[in-house]
């Protein structure tokens, strides 16, 4: 075991001197005891970032450096940061170095995995292009997710990002028997706490809590930048284990990918790198690429990632969101205007898109129904000014029909969620893709022109609409 001594502390950056010829490798984890954090031994982890000459390294701390003094002993673990992986992590909250922070005792994991590793080699990657069915109508129809793909989730505060994430976790557990991993990167601790409590209270079909199928890895706003820039990698290591060792289709949620970049830029400046555009780190695209390339389908299983993306000052050309966009297969945009209409999930069908919506992938029927739905909704949007000024009576008969169908489509895009059952009083619905396509096709073909539009609101498939209509008629 190689032992070094602290020579300098600059905020979250710590310089350590080692005996000549015994320098730890870049990305190795070093451990020491910081009495200011707790009385536990080896409670502070440092990650080697740079070699400074023959005997000194510059490291980034994963926790507070308050209380460190020069001359303190630091030992080299000889390997990268290792986190516990496997079923023992489900239902637990861990921090960036895999220590449980939910006060529920230690994690008795049989295996640990390094947070840094190479993406799967080409020979192991799956070349099959498969749709990842979520059971949520608007997503499956308009912006289908790719198995092993990356999805950007855009939305302001209070439009339903968390509920959508909860429902996806629930549906993955139900439909695919799969697990989810949630990385809380630089967001509010209160939100992380709320998510844990909501997942503990929401129930799966078999009555067990949603949390029993998810692992939560948190590095929130109050953490040093070292922890925030690495916590997404810790979560990815947990997800990769379920994919590679247990052959599962895993959902990885990252909230928020912008904070990952932001933390990287804080660390970069402290390491003395010359900043590039807008003050971001010069290694921005390399760091993002190293993270995103590990999210993929292999011949054993897949990691599908849903990433919430904060857009600073609503500027889509900012280097941080722009770098993330390059990796996305689909975007799901949540709209406040739609949530104000009481339509949940508040996904904007005209703004959301996916590379999977291609007739060669999803088939001619799915593609044409999705495009017809968008055309109808776009026409309705164009007519809204006329309706607001002159009223419905001034429209042609054709346009009146378009408006009536568009309003039914809009209502039918809503759906009762399992995890929101306690708010809506309605049982959640998981709608198979073929039922979704058939339902929208019937509306577009005018087969349901006689049905009142309120019968389309918060239902599952088209059979529910017909049942609701006949119930009202009787």
Swiss-Prot record:
Function comment: Produces ATP from ADP in the presence of a proton gradient across the membrane. The catalytic sites are hosted primarily by the beta subunits.
Lineage per the UniProt record: Bacteria, Pseudomonadati, Myxococcota, Polyangia, Polyangiales
NCBIfam families (alphabetical): atpD (TIGR01039)
Topology with respect to the bilayer: Peripheral membrane protein
Enzyme class: translocase
Subcellular location field: Cell inner membrane
Protein family (similarity comment): Belongs to the ATPase alpha/beta chains family.
GO MF, any single term: ATP hydrolysis activity
Catalysed reactions, as listed in the record: ATP + H2O + 4 H(+)(in) = ADP + phosphate + 5 H(+)(out)
Keywords of the record: ATP synthesis, ATP-binding, Cell inner membrane, Cell membrane, CF(1), Hydrogen ion transport, Ion transport, Membrane, Nucleotide-binding, Translocase, Transport
Binding site for ATP: 155-162
Protein name: ATP synthase subunit beta
Gene from which this protein is expressed: atpD
Domain of life of the native organism: Bacteria
Assembly: F-type ATPases have 2 components, CF(1) - the catalytic core - and CF(0) - the membrane proton channel. CF(1) has five subunits: alpha(3), beta(3), gamma(1), delta(1), epsilon(1). CF(0) has three main subunits: a(1), b(2) and c(9-12). The alpha and beta chains form an alternating ring which encloses part of the gamma chain. CF(1) is attached to CF(0) by a central stalk formed by the gamma and epsilon chains, while a peripheral stalk is formed by the delta and b chains.
